[in-house]
UniProtKB/Swiss-Prot annotation:
The gene is fluC3. This is Fluoride-specific ion channel FluC 3. The chain crosses the membrane at residues 62-82, 96-116, 125-145, 158-178. Coiled coil: none annotated. It comes from the Bacteria. The keyword Ion transport applies. Residues 1-16 have a biased composition (Basic and acidic residues). HAMAP family: FluC. InterPro entries: FluC. Fluoride-specific ion channel. Important for reducing fluoride concentration in the cell, thus reducing its toxicity.
Amino acid sequence: MRADESGPERESREPTHIPGAEPELGGEPTPRGEPGPGFEPGPGGEPAPSRAPFRSRLRKGVLAAVALGGVLGGSARYALGLTFPTPRGTFPVTTFAVNVSGAFLLALLLVYVLEIWPPTRYVRPFAAVGFLGSFTTFSTWMVDTDRLLGHGHYAVAAFNVFGSLFAGLAATGLGLAIGRMALARRVRLAARHGRARRYGWWVR
């Protein structure tokens, strides 16, 4: 053995590799047999079961809720269109009413879901994304506007565009106002009965 390959100098040049003890970025290697950072033991010190199956089931449940809400919302709008058809060349009252009422209901629902009701997994995907998302329609609104322009009803087409926008904004504001009034009332009742809680982000 050569002199330059023995002693502490050799150990400093060639550190012993321990399988399973690779260092993490910016940290020291974890000795083999010891839990690494972020390890959460389960009962009895055993590794906790993976949450991947639960997340997979939750994702499927959310998708199913969105799909079911979409079927019901689209069917409701289609039924309203058949019940209250719009004659060609006239103002599309049904589409206008559907979009404005949908804006109001969505604003009211989100206040209840985010500020009042306890946390849920499926109400928002089902009602907001699924039902109201398919109940309201941007494409039919634009198609109706194009048909009005095609028949030369320019004033009616302009009212359909701008009237829907402003009415939708007003309906959204009304839904938020009603929802927040209900939220403030619940806060007052809870405080009156000695059950004061912190409801919402704006009532503190």
